[in-house]
Amino acid sequence: LSLPSRLFTSLAKPKTKVGEYKGVDVLLCATHDTASAVEGMNVEEGEPYLSSGTWSLLGLKVPSPITDEKSMEGNWSNEGGVGYTRYQKNIMGMWLINRLKEELAPSITFTEFNALTESSSFTGYVDAEDSSFLSPESMKDAFDHKLNREGLKAEDYFRSAVISLSKSYGKSIRELEENTKRRFNRLYIVGGGANNELLNRLTEKETG
């Protein structure tokens, strides 16, 4: 872009003090918003985290990058943290739920959405990581196709999406355990998805 170098400061690590403002130290953040969210979590050493937003990030703080073939094949990445590496995976998140709500019940609140979802006894689910759910013209139609059925009630689609996400999280935790040779007893969840009680309960069940 031919930008002059004077526009840029020197490279520095996260948490480096760069100045003060009205007596308050100004520090560099942890590279970006999600990294900063992870840094702000009270995560015990050796326990995984899940940033549950439109897209979900599930991972673990590790001392150094993990770059074996399993990690590459499973789309696990290594990103900078504050004195550690975030070994994590970008997976489907509330995008499924938000798109279905927007399409099937745009006027209801999320409190009403959660109540509707709880009222359904539907047990069908899809592979939340399937590429057909990334940007479908109709999320409902995408679910119909993968579930191989039509005519479900709105609450059934909602519950199916929640079940599907929990199973995706469970699968990713098992991959993380295998890749790091560890067994986890706790999962820390932050973000909007942390407010979905049914999703939390099903995630607890799927992750053991």
Q: What spans do the regions from the language model cover?
A:
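Active-site core segments that coordinate phosphate-bearing ligands/cofactors
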Residues: 22-187, 195-208
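Gly/Ser/Thr-rich active-site cleft segment
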Residues: 1-24, 28-32
